[in-house]
Amino acid sequence: MLPESSLSFLKRLLDSPGPSGFESIPARVWREEAKTFATDVRGDVAGNSLAEVNPKGSPTIMLDGHIDEIGLIVQYIDDEGFAHVGPIGGWDPQVLVGQRIRLLGRDGDVFGVIGKKPIHLMKNDDREKASKMSDLWVDIGAANKAEAEERLQVGDPGVIDSRAMDFPNKRLVSRSIDDRIGAFTALEALRRYAKNPGKARVVAVASTQEEIAWHGGGALICAACLNPKMAIVIDVTHASDSPGMEKKELGDHKLGSGPVLTRGALINPVVFSLLRTAAEKKKIPFTINAAGRDTSTNADAIHIAREGVATALVSIPNRYMHSPNEMVSLEDVERTAELIAEVCREVGERTDFTAR
């Protein structure tokens, strides 16, 4: 299992508010933890955080997990003091109704509740309709616009006000698991690599803006700067073991079944083979996801950076993605970190990533 110190760090990371474009709070938490063992820790102008082990080693391996989460942003404050918000990233507005929200105001946190017309007052036809973002507002308890603007301004971001919780069977529930769990796992893999390093220079990256940037956001910037020969992207994928999930379309990736190794059009076959071989050698359970086109992750951008990067995608099964309460297995997280650390030890200057 993950040590208590790592679990404590993970919960601090998950509880930190940091929607896309506003990731500075979780980024600081990540960098503070990285400084406890990494050789070099730094940030960049795009908000990315980087931690490095074996800086004189070769080749360079990039481990990427995006640290941003979906959120909300204040677009308008009306005369009655209600804030009207838009999405940062992809929300199902249905899950927002009645939630408590934590807005990052100019002088600190501002808490509110997301309101909607009560069902008692709706016409019959409206009761059957799905909520739209425009149907919702945020009530911060202000009496009027002037009072609200003392605490909030247009452009202030926010997240759902919830905290990480332990669940039975070594499961963890939190908002921001997509993909702060990937940023955590990248650093946890680096920590394990640091205890028994191989020949490679390994850089863990907590990248920004994945939820809003189709071009790869902060991950593309890091890939251009680091010029890695190999990259492993760590993200989440849909767990297949909750009601309504179609395994014929998604594959079979249950909570607790281990890391999910993607195989497909954008994935370097050499790196995929390294991952599968290492998992079999270490007796780490895993499943395979087939991707016939793009993956909708940072892997899509990283693999075409500079002259091209040998890229793989390792995912952690996640229930209830893009909701206030996502769920993962801590066993899957630990196995993913252990697998990635082992693969990094297997790579050296003679490793040929050319697909043959």
Role assignments for model-derived ranges:
Residues 1-356:
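N-terminal hydrophobic/helix-forming segments and targeting peptides
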